């Protein structure tokens, strides 16, 4: 990474020191106007139970990746972001740092910016700071599945962009991607909506599912800004996704599954982490692997595992540029802008390591 690009680690971002600093008496106003709408409410656990059962019944067994993203899981994922082996974080930050003015050029004053899977919002702060420096009035909506982590991130943002002086209006949605798409259909807003999906998160889904998600969001009339990873160095990918921090993150999903099920069906001591590359899907896959023969009893159902059998936890696609174009076209979208990471030292092929794309609905598609 270029020496003039700030490292992503740590909060607040480097520019935040110049932000407005309210005194203690204004703390109520600073946080009082924060709106967080919970679209999941009390149905979260109940909705995950059938997904867990269905995944264990399947021939290709898997658990919902949503199990990874509770408050503890997000904390463990932040440790991954700080790991030197996890190349994505600083590479994406460098790309955003170098191209942020071009990336936000299509966002006009009065527009709505919705971030999917907002996480800790460090990158968000850079983007909002740039929009504010351009004197644009923006309605920013952060969407994430964990309410506690979402509120924490929003308060960090509001400390930098206080409602009393900032041109950025901040709001939160506790929602899955499906919840968010449905909410956007019901709430089209008065201006254009740009959806921001960073961190290679779209690539947690196989290409056909990724296309369906893009289609569902484009159908709301929004455009998308996607950040994706095109690394083709399998050794580099393994170091990034199979280290100790990743293993803790993935295995935490079993603890969360027990919480959701209200049982101790998954004894973490009986499972190990396994990572491998799936060449057919251009994806790295993480699994829970049985350390011995196991019998799981969940409700009235019994699931038998032989030693070494696996349950898939999460995937991460590493798609070259032509594959990204195909995925977007399958969704009825057209990639109109590319911002590429210029560092070609990553990967055993000449595929560039990372890029952001702006996707609009194809005017000639059905």
Swiss-Prot record:
Induction: Expression is positively regulated by the fumisoquins biosynthesis specific transcription factor fsqA. Residues 1-18 form the signal peptide. Disruption phenotype: Leads to complete abolishment of isoquinoline alkaloid production and accumulation of a series of benzyl pyrroles, including fumipyrrole. Gene3D superfamilies: Vaccinia Virus protein VP39. Pathway: Secondary metabolite biosynthesis. One of its GO terms (molecular function) is methyltransferase activity. It is an enzyme of class 2 (transferase). Disulfide bonds: none annotated. Its EC number is 2.1.1.-. Keywords: Glycoprotein, Methyltransferase, S-adenosyl-L-methionine, Signal, Transferase. GO terms for biological process: methylation. Glycans are attached at residue 270. N-methyltransferase; part of the gene cluster that mediates the biosynthesis of the isoquinoline alkaloids fumisoquin A, fumisoquin B and fumisoquin C; as well as small amounts of fumipyrrole as a shunt metabolite. The products of the cluster lead to a brown coloration and are important for growth and conidiation. The nonribosomal peptide synthetase-like protein fsqF, which lacks a canonical condensation domain, is required for addition of a serine-derived dehydroalanine moiety to activated tyrosine but is not essential for the subsequent steps leading to isoquinoline formation. Belongs to the methyltransferase superfamily. This is N-methyltransferase fsqC. It comes from Aspergillus fumigatus (strain ATCC MYA-4609 / CBS 101355 / FGSC A1100 / Af293). The lineage of its organism: Eukaryota, Fungi, Dikarya, Ascomycota, Pezizomycotina.
């Amino acid at each position: 990474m270029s020496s003039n690009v700030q490292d992503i680690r740590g909060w607040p971002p480097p520019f935040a020191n110049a932000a407005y600093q309210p005194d203690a008496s204004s703390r109520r106003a600073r946080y009082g106007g924060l709106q967080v709408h919970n679209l999941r409410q009390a149905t979260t656990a109940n909705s995950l139970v059938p997904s867990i059962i269905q995944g264990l019944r399947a021939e290709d067994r898997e658990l919902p990746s949503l199990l990874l993203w509770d408050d503890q899981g997000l904390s463990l994922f932040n440790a991954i972001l700080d790991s030197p082996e996890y190349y994505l974080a600083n590479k994406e930050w460098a790309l955003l740092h170098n191209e942020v003015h071009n990336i936000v050029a299509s966002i006009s004053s009065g527009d709505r910016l919705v971030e999917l899977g907002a996480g800790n919002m460090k990158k968000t702060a850079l983007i909002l700071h740039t929009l504010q420096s351009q004197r644009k009035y923006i309605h920013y909506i952060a969407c994430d599945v964990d309410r506690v982590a979402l509120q924490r991130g929003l308060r960090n943002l509001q400390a930098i962009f206080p409602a009393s002086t900032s041109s950025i209006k901040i709001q939160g949605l506790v929602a899955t991607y499906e919840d968010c798409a449905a909410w956007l259909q019901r709430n089209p807003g008065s201006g254009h909506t740009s959806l921001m999906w960073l961190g290679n998160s779209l690539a947690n889904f196989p290409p056909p599912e990724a296309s369906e998600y893009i289609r569902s969001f484009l159908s709301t009339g929004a455009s998308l800004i996607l950040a994706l990873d095109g690394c083709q160095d399998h050794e580099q990918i393994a170091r990034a996704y199979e280290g100790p921090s990743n293993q803790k993150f993935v295995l935490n999903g079993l603890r969360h599954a027990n919480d959701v099920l209200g049982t101790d069906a998954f004894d973490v001591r009986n499972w190990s982490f396994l990572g491998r590359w799936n060449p057919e899907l251009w994806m790295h896959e993480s699994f829970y692997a049985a350390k011995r023969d196991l019998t799981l009893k969940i409700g009235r159902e019994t699931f038998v595992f032989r030693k070494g059998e696996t349950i898939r936890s999460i995937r991460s696609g590493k798609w070259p540029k032509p594959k990204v174009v195909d995925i977007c076209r399958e969704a009825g979208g057209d990639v109109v802008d590319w911002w590429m990471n210029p560092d070609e030292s990553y990967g055993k092929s000449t595929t560039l390591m990372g890029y952001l794309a702006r996707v609009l609905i194809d005017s000639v598609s059905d």
